[in-house]
Amino acid sequence: MAKNKGVRIVITLECTECRSNPAKRSPGVSRYTTEKNRRNTTERLEIKKFCPHCNKMTPHKEIK
């Protein structure tokens, strides 16, 4: 029998300032992967994390 997938899903967090800021340290967009519990956190996640391209702590929002 196949197991149920469960409520934890893998999500990608992307830097919000890298997309709009042309004057950053290096080209590219910072992305992190993490898991979230779909039952407890139904809305999109937003966490402050370090962005190596901006070289500072920036808000990272959940993308697809």
UniProtKB/Swiss-Prot annotation:
UniProt keyword Ribonucleoprotein, yes or no: yes
Ribosomal protein in keyword set: yes
Record-level Gene Ontology MF annotations: structural constituent of ribosome
InterPro entries named among the record's database cross-references: Ribosomal_bL33, Ribosomal_bL33_CS, Ribosomal_bL33_sf, Ribosomal_zn-bd
Signal peptide start-end: none
Alphabetical UniProt keywords: Ribonucleoprotein, Ribosomal protein
GO biological processes: translation
Entry-linked Pfam families: Ribosomal_L33 (PF00471)
Gene Ontology CC terms: cytoplasm; ribonucleoprotein complex; ribosome
PANTHER family membership: 50S RIBOSOMAL PROTEIN L33, CHLOROPLASTIC, LARGE RIBOSOMAL SUBUNIT PROTEIN BL33C
HAMAP family associated with the record: Ribosomal_bL33
Entry's family note: Belongs to the bacterial ribosomal protein bL33 family.
NCBIfam families, sorted: PRK00504.1, PRK00595.1, rpmG_bact
Protein name: Large ribosomal subunit protein bL33
Organism whose genome encodes this protein: Parasynechococcus marenigrum (strain WH8102)
Gene: rpmG
